[in-house]
Amino acid sequence: MEISWGRAMWRNFLGQSPDWYKLALLVFLIVNPFIFLANPFIAGWLLVAEFIFTLAMALKCYPLLPGGLLAIEAVIIGMTSAAHVREEVAANLEVLLLLMFMVAGIYFMKQLLLFIFTRLLLSIRSKMVLSLAFCVAAAFLSAFLDALTVVAVVISVAVGFYGIYHRVASSRGEENDMLDDSHIDPHYKTVLEQFRGFLRSLMMHAGVGTALGGVMTMVGEPQNLIIAKAAGWHFGDFFLRMSPVTVPVLVCGLLTCMLVEKMRWFGYGETLPEKVRDVLQQFDDQSRKKRTRQDKIKLIVQAIIGVWLVTALALHLAEVGLIGLSVIILATALTGVTDEHAIGKAFTESLPFTALLTVFFSIVAVIIDQHLFAPIIQFVLQASEHAQLTLFYLFNGLLSSISDNVFVGTIYINEAKAAMENGAISLKQFELLAVAINTGTNLPSVATPNGQAAFLFLLTSALAPLIRLSYGRMVWMALPYTIVLTLIGLLCVEFTLAPATEWMTQAGWLATLS
């Protein structure tokens, strides 16, 4: 017997999501207008909490759908306007270009990356050394590339590793579905679970590595560039001014990487199963035997494009997204990828997240229109100069862990600059606050996927369900890093930032905003 119209509509609404999740979203959509009529400020914070809930439940339903419904309702009931949403999207166009083109550009360099990381994986047997290598590599790359780009690289490598073993374990060859474990016998499943744990730990080490490296340079994160422009700093100035905080944090972050692997804490310490190593070794041997001169030329071309990518980003020759577009054009033209459908596959990973980030900008518009952060900013600026550094750092960290760190950094640096221009704080204090804002925005935000766009990208990627990386597990695995990075950063802001900056200024190393 065919189901009723109502039942059919309920099943279609958010598809396979659990009934309790669908019901929760309906409750949100029903109560929001009434709360907004009663108290817009409370309604604004409630909307932020609801959006965070949809992100936390990313594996139940992709957040674009429920988050998008909440955003549409927010515009309809007047929490913000469509014009303001457009302004936020326009202001963050370079971030969207980055997602659309840079992430897709990396897709066409996967052969080279898989080759390099396979050699790295097979040549380093110590899990601690391998984890450290992934963390250091991610940190170094993130100093020149955006963290999203680096995470996209590591995701593509991990999916490649996983796919190689899953094909062997399922005995289904090229027709293998990586999400389907039904054809894998119990023995292989045990090994597969261990392999998942191994990949989870590598992904988290690499993800945190992007935060460690990304905070150090003005091109490491989008908000870094905004803060550098506001303070009038160039590449070298930015690096030196951040170094009293970022260098100790980097050292302690790498020590944390070694400690959690050694002690097998927080889900770390899983080693690469020998059976998987053998499969990957065989794959590598076969790949090398089958590699034709044409294939070798492709690898060389991809390596040259990689050099162009790092050089263009380091010298900031163009916007990051446009450099990514140049990578797509060069990589496809010089490696013979000419079919539209083959090129289209490169965009399947990044475009859903681009749409999700656009939805997020509408939530940002609500935050601005409802002045949700105003009480916090007023409270901080009323404190003493020394306390301001600590408070800016802590409030940036708190808000960045639940909100977009680009937005938080932008709001705070604009408020700090306005305070300087109005005479509320000195130029010297503003420059110290800029460091506190940048480090506070970047370091504590590793606590949750909400704060780091790279973490959110990982959580909502095709890899997350393969290696069973949920929101809760990601928060748990990030916890030791969150504690160490936040505390060391706070201590450095409190005790080393001002004297180290004063010393570098007297030595003539630092430029000052005129």
Curated annotation (Swiss-Prot):
It comes from the Bacteria. It holds the Pfam family NhaB. GO terms for cellular component: plasma membrane. It catalyses: 2 Na(+)(in) + 3 H(+)(out) = 2 Na(+)(out) + 3 H(+)(in). The chain crosses the membrane at residues 23-43, 63-83, 97-117, 120-140, 144-164, 202-222, 238-258, 303-323, 357-377, 391-411, 447-467, 475-495. Its main location: membrane. InterPro entries: Na+/H+_antiporter_NhaB. One of its GO terms (molecular function) is sodium:proton antiporter activity. Signal peptide: none annotated. It is a multi-pass membrane protein. It is found in: Cell inner membrane. Keywords: Antiport, Cell inner membrane, Cell membrane, Ion transport, Membrane, Sodium, Sodium transport, Transmembrane, Transmembrane helix, Transport. Na(+)/H(+) antiporter that extrudes sodium in exchange for external protons. Belongs to the NhaB Na(+)/H(+) (TC 2.A.34) antiporter family. NCBIfam families: NhaB, PRK09547.1. PANTHER family: NA(+)_H(+) ANTIPORTER NHAB (PTHR43302:SF1), TRANSPORTER ARSB-RELATED (PTHR43302). This is Na(+)/H(+) antiporter NhaB. It comes from Salmonella typhimurium (strain LT2 / SGSC1412 / ATCC 700720). The gene is nhaB.
